Design a protein with these regions (language model features):
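Structural beta-alpha unit
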Residues: 1-11, 16, 129-164, 170-171, ...
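Short beta-strand elements of ligand-binding domains
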Residues: 10-13, 38-44, 193-196
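Glycine-rich, Arg-bearing micro-motifs that act as flexible, cationic patches
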Residues: 11-30, 161-187
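Short acidic active-site motifs
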Residues: 27, 124, 146-151, 180
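Short, structured interface segments
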Residues: 28-47
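General small-molecule cofactor/ligand-binding pocket signal
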Residues: 40, 89-91, 137-142, 193
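Small/aliphatic-rich secondary-structure junction motif
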Residues: 52-108, 131, 187-188, 192, ...
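A short acidic, glycine-rich active-site loop
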Residues: 109-120
């Protein structure tokens, strides 16, 4: 893969007969974490005509690499939408008010704080969507953990594909780090396209040098 410079790796996934959910193997996780090319994990499910494709973004990130990855996620998702005659939607999760802050600071107003965070995420996501001529109706900005929000929105929309960014060993773009990345993907019951940021160098490539 690294030596030949392929543009895409497609890997089949297995469905657990009892749980009726997709089971990702250690090989799947290895590819997601270390493969420099986009990885498409597919299940045995046909894509419907005029379906939905969901792009998972973090519109409030201030990291330039993450912001660039957001745009790549949307561009690649839109390209697939054009091929599949599907509708593109964005999903952005924002955190709930930390309980410990409300307890430790008596004058803290959790309601006001939560509204401020929500407003920031809505405005940032809508602005990102506008760059790609997407309407606000195509944006889903919801409170909660990414591993809860993204699969929930994907299920409600009956999305055939979720496009998501990964940044190697640190997990998914921006807020999606560590085990959170695996929880998100593990909770999705649809195809997943995992993208790396531009300039990503696989640790496997370093070993080959």
């Amino acid at each position: 893969m690294i030596n030949d410079g392929y543009d895409l790796v497609v890997k089949g996934t297995h469905q657990h007969d009892t749980l009726k959910s997709v089971i990702f193997t250690p090989t799947d996780w290895h590819l997601i974490r270390k493969c420099p090319a986009p990885v498409l994990l597919v299940k045995e499910k046909e894509w419907p005509a005029h379906g939905n494709i969901l792009a998972a973004v973090n519109a409030v990130s201030e990291n330039e690499q993450h912001l660039a990855l957001n745009k790549r996620i949307i561009n690649d998702a839109r390209f697939i939408c054009d091929l599949a005659n599907a509708q593109l939607n964005l999903v952005n999760a924002y955190p709930a008010t930390p309980v410990n802050i409300a307890i430790e600071i008596p004058e803290f107003n959790p309601g006001l704080y939560n509204e401020s965070v929500k407003k920031h995420h809505i405005e940032s996501t809508n602005a990102l969507a506008a760059e790609f001529n997407l309407s606000q109706e195509q944006c889903f900005i919801e409170e909660g953990l990414p591993e809860d929000v993204i699969p929930d929105v994907a299920k409600r929309l009956n999305s055939e594909l979720v496009v998501i960014g990964t940044v190697g060993r640190t997990g998914l773009s921006a807020a999606l780090v560590g085990n959170t990345a695996e929880h998100v993907i593990d909770s999705l019951d649809c195809d997943v396209l995992a993208l790396k940021p531009d300039g990503y160098v696989s640790p496997m490539a370093k070993k080959l040098d």
